[in-house]
Amino acid sequence: MEPFRIHKGTAAVLMNDNIDTDQIIPKQYLKRIERTGFGKFLFDEWRYDNERHENPNFPLNSPDRKGASILITGNNFGCGSSREHAPWALADYGFRVIIAGGFADIFYMNCMKNGMLPIVMDKEMREKLVKTDAREQIEVDLENEVITTSTHRFHFTIEKMWKEKLLNGLDEISITMQYEQEIKEYERRVAAY
């Protein structure tokens, strides 16, 4: 996993509450286990009409918001099924940071396991961020737990364990590999059956 230290990007805004994993990536696209190729189906039922034309009223289809890598959204983002495809779709689309009023617990963990930074932020602060010009680069500094725009500076918090994993680009496998010597020593000591 790529280390996450400072991210600069533009933001897309979808301030709906209770966006569930089926809305993030509909079930008909979940027949694969690769982590890539899901971005084109992100928010599929909202982004496209029945003939697969882009819905011009959907925020991610706005020309100013294309290429955004920060998503600012409502409360309880990622609720519903615990499938990991939802974070895969967000990451494959290009999002690195998701700022919400809150997240479903499993979704929150799955974001970090996939190298995305989910940030919990109250509504007042999110509304200030939403007013940022669509073309303005927003800086998210994980090490100092700060989000900076041209007019505001916001602090956020993250559990130390998750922060260290993201800063160092560690997933479960790479963490396990840090204990390779101890594992080999244990296997040498313990009799095989």
Curated annotation (Swiss-Prot):
GO CC term (a single one): 3-isopropylmalate dehydratase complex
EC primary class: lyase
GO molecular function terms attached to this record: 3-isopropylmalate dehydratase activity
Any one Gene Ontology BP term: L-leucine biosynthetic process
Pathway(s) it belongs to: Amino-acid biosynthesis; L-leucine biosynthesis; L-leucine from 3-methyl-2-oxobutanoate: step 2/4
Segments passing through the bilayer: none
Alphabetized UniProt keyword annotations: Amino-acid biosynthesis, Branched-chain amino acid biosynthesis, Leucine biosynthesis, Lyase
EC number: 4.2.1.33
Xref: InterPro entries: 3-IsopropMal_deHydase_ssu, Aconitase/3IPM_dehydase_swvl, AconitaseA/IPMdHydase_ssu_swvl, IPMI_Swivel, LeuD
Signal peptide from the UniProt entry: none
CDD domains per record: IPMI_Swivel (cd01577)
Catalysis: reaction(s): (2R,3S)-3-isopropylmalate = (2S)-2-isopropylmalate
One Pfam family here: Aconitase_C
Keyword Lyase attached: yes
Function (record text): Catalyzes the isomerization between 2-isopropylmalate and 3-isopropylmalate, via the formation of 2-isopropylmaleate.
Family: Belongs to the LeuD family. LeuD type 1 subfamily.
Assembly mode: Heterodimer of LeuC and LeuD.
Protein name, UniProt field: 3-isopropylmalate dehydratase small subunit
Species: Bacillus cereus (strain AH820)
